[in-house]
């Protein structure tokens, strides 16, 4: 199910020459590293527009589905996503960056790449991948997006929003 939760500002408001960034977010602090990158680009005098994206994975666990319907789960995920997106948009709006928010359900890497192409983004901004040992216990979306990358370049940033040397793929 594709659904747009809320549109904060028109993505095109950044102007014709604006650097259009796709910033995927979730409930982790790591996902906010790209917000700092966008703010820094803006502070450096660049015309920037940001699209925040939250992708909810489909819940298929029988332990959850035993107590909740798919519709209840979708509604909960959409409400949670809306809160996260509004919270993530706040610092960008305060920095004068036009923001659009998007909500999708399904495969995370696919939707990141798909939305970036649909919105004609110039960059997808993701946190640096976890160290190899941490990959064993976490879902490493950055590596998966890089592996499946199509036409939109991926910029990997650190905790301060600073792109890693040679990280733009």
Where do the language-model regions lie?
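Structural beta-alpha unit
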Residues: 1-10, 93-124, 161-169
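Glycine-rich, Arg-bearing micro-motifs that act as flexible, cationic patches
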Residues: 126-147, 163-166
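General small-molecule cofactor/ligand-binding pocket signal
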Residues: 51-53, 100-104, 155-157
